[in-house]
């Protein structure tokens, strides 16, 4: 019950301004208006005009490969001008520590020509190369930490360490996803998205400034959300160059905004062979709904200008077909109404079915809130093992877990 309440509070944090912000707001109202509940009052008319002409379901007059090429090109166009590519990644290990069955590294590298960033990398003990997972952190209206939500940090301030642990307790049932997967033989990798963690504001964290910064980026002809996706693609390219990584066995995973990043990365990068997205899938019709009293809460975090004129969320995610994909959503997730999730899953299945690959697509609705608890992490591990470690069984996962617990208790 406590975990359910904690997960619900995280959801609320993403929706409501702080009490201090509320006090500062001086509301002046006119008798007439054109926006209500943060949506235009003509939202239903606008949605009716969205026909999604580049969705696979509306492009059956061309081959799947031609559609994929055209649709990807449109997504890239809507991501706007990319950051200039780095001439080299120039990686540098700046810190490391031995953990239970794996080594934790901090690596600095050039993700693009403008940004040299820090990544956490976990490398299993033993002889590689190993399969690898690019772990994509959530939003949560909490920007102070990013990669530290996915991999237990080290060599950081006490404040960062405590914040990361508290976040893991709330959204991930006390288990860092990266450390869990590393114990089961995966190289795990995570970076901060722009605006999170070590890529935030010099003046300090202020969620209200995110949209202002995103608007300023647009004035420069760039899109902040697009930069996030370009960085996810580039960081996967970097991950594939590491000597202990099998470049043909790379997956990605995330929860909430991390799930959105995961299916976007799966759709846009051929280096990703399998993906897992926990608690982020819906149709625009339900996401922006007066009937469901719903609207988008992430702001510019998942805003690619103009893209909705061509494809809906499930259509974009379907660019990942026919590779293996796992989607888990929650019936108690207040951000994504079940009927919208079911609509999206139906569209996605139609694409995989058209390619004779529906057996590689797993979409599940669990009785959970907005979260990525241990059961979801186990399911993701099993899914990764199935496609990145053929021959692995559920019993072998159990045996590995017992061995790790035994080592921890010594």
What annotation goes with each model-predicted range?
Residues 96-156:
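Glycine-rich active-site/cofactor-binding loop and its immediate structural neighborhood
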Residues 320, 327-329:
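Short beta-strand/loop motif that positions the catalytic acidic residue
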Residues 244-256:
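Alpha/beta-hydrolase fold nucleophile elbow
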Residues 332-340, 370-371:
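Acidic catalytic loop of the alpha/beta-hydrolase fold
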Residues 212, 216-219, 234, 274-317, ...:
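Mobile cap/lid helix-loop segments that gate and shape the active-site cleft of serine hydrolases
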Residues 20-103, 111, 146, 397-410:
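N-terminal targeting or regulatory segments adjacent to alpha/beta-hydrolase or S9 domains
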Residues 346-403, 410:
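C-terminal catalytic histidine-bearing segment of alpha/beta-hydrolase fold enzymes
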Residues 128, 135-230, 240-241, 286-289, ...:
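Cap/lid segment of the alpha/beta-hydrolase catalytic domain
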